[in-house]
């Protein structure tokens, strides 16, 4: 049973738990490390112990599940004291535990913010601290920043400050697009991020992208033809039916192709709500923060910008 099907039978608090569970498959890894491409990772994937963030106390870290993989420590060389070996090992474990807790808090906050977006409600810093961050208030800037980045990259949702004095925020779709795919109660994951990715690909292909190239690029983020996706549902239906019916995409046979091949173009609604320039700027902006999942698109976007397109 998919996440969206499960949510139909859940109470609000149970839906949040189910959603946060699924968000373990969201790109938290991308938001936590600029050296990684944007892929769908799991909460069990813990950054290496080379991070400069200070470790938490053992009491604070022990609340996280113990399903964490640690790097095997090398055997001490002859003559080294047990104290010398114990120090780095303990530090490494505490660091890994701390980073794992932060990663889970990011996923939890993404789930909380998605519920706020679905309800079309603003959110305050105080709400986030009380409902999600709790004992990790000192880590709020990091957790909030990474959660905001994940929302933008995966779901196409921007977190915008509405009231600086009251630390109040609103959640809106990126690039001025009015589509999010939330057409019913069973649609719990916004699809704007998927739409933006496809629009970027088409723009980079000069306005029309072969279907096979679209699927090849989508496979980089583990979105495959015929395979249900935790965030986007059935991708072929979303790509060739839903977004076409919403007039964001055109899906047509390549003229004179035999055997028949198909391609995607921007639909009239996409052309009315955004522009090639905006999506190029989006690619450059995002890839300046993390290594973009389509490096070739970033390079093409930079070339287009230099040429004044």
From Swiss-Prot:
Xref: PROSITE patterns: MAGE
Please describe the organ and tissue distribution of this protein's expression. Expressed in many tumors of several types, such as melanoma, head and neck squamous cell carcinoma, lung carcinoma and breast carcinoma, but not in normal tissues except for testes. Never expressed in kidney tumors, leukemias and lymphomas.
GO cellular component, alphabetical, reads:
cytoplasm; nucleus; plasma membrane
Q: Where is the composition biased (Polar residues)?
A: 49-64
Q: What is the effect of changing residue 278 to T?
A: In a breast cancer sample; somatic mutation
Question: What's any GO biological process attached to this entry?
Answer: negative regulation of Notch signaling pathway
Keyword terms of this UniProt record: Cytoplasm, Nucleus, Phosphoprotein, Transcription, Transcription regulation, Tumor antigen
Q: Where in the cell is it found?
A: Cytoplasm; Nucleus
Phosphoserine PTM sites in chain numbering: 57
Subunit (UniProt): Interacts with SNW1 and HDCA1.
Which purpose does this protein serve, as stated in its record?
Answer: May be involved in transcriptional regulation through interaction with SNW1 and recruiting histone deactelyase HDAC1. May inhibit notch intracellular domain (NICD) transactivation. May play a role in embryonal development and tumor transformation or aspects of tumor progression. Antigen recognized on a melanoma by autologous cytolytic T-lymphocytes.
Q: Which PANTHER family match?
A: MELANOMA-ASSOCIATED ANTIGEN 1 (PTHR11736:SF49), MELANOMA-ASSOCIATED ANTIGEN MAGE ANTIGEN (PTHR11736)
Kindly provide the name given to this protein in its UniProt entry: Melanoma-associated antigen 1
Q: Which organism is it from?
A: Homo sapiens
The gene that this protein is the product of is MAGEA1
């Amino acid at each position: 049973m998919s996440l969206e099907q499960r949510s139909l039978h859940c109470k609000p608090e149970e839906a949040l738990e189910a959603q946060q569970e699924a968000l373990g498959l969201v790109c938290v890894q991308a938001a936590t490390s600029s050296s990684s491409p944007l892929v769908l990772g799991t909460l069990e994937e813990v950054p290496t112990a080379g991070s400069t963030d200070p470790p938490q106390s053992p009491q604070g870290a022990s609340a996280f599940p113990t399903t964490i993989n640690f790097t095997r420590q090398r055997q001490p060389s002859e003559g080294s004291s047990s104290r010398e070996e114990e120090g780095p090992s303990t530090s490494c474990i505490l660091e890994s535990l701390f980073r794992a807790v932060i990663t889970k808090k990011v996923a939890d906050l993404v789930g909380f913010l998605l519920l706020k977006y679905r309800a079309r409600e603003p959110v305050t810093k105080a709400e986030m601290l009380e409902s999600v961050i709790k004992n990790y208030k000192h880590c709020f800037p990091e957790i909030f920043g990474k959660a905001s980045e994940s929302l933008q990259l995966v779901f196409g949702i921007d977190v915008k400050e509405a009231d600086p004095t009251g630390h109040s925020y609103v959640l809106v779709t990126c690039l001025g697009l009015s589509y999010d795919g939330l057409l019913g109660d069973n649609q719990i994951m916004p699809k704007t991020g998927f739409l933006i990715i496809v629009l970027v690909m088409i723009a980079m292909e000069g306005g029309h992208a072969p279907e096979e190239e679209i699927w090849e690029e989508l496979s980089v983020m583990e979105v495959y033809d015929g395979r249900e996706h935790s965030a986007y549902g059935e991708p072929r239906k979303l790509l060739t039916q839903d977004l076409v019916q919403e007039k964001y995409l055109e899906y047509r046979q390549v003229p004179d192709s035999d055997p028949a091949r198909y391609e995607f173009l921007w639909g009239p609604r996409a052309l009315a709500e955004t522009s090639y320039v905006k999506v190029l700027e989006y690619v450059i902006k995002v890839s300046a923060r993390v290594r973009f999942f389509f490096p070739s698109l970033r390079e093409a976007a930079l070339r287009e910008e230099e040429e004044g397109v």
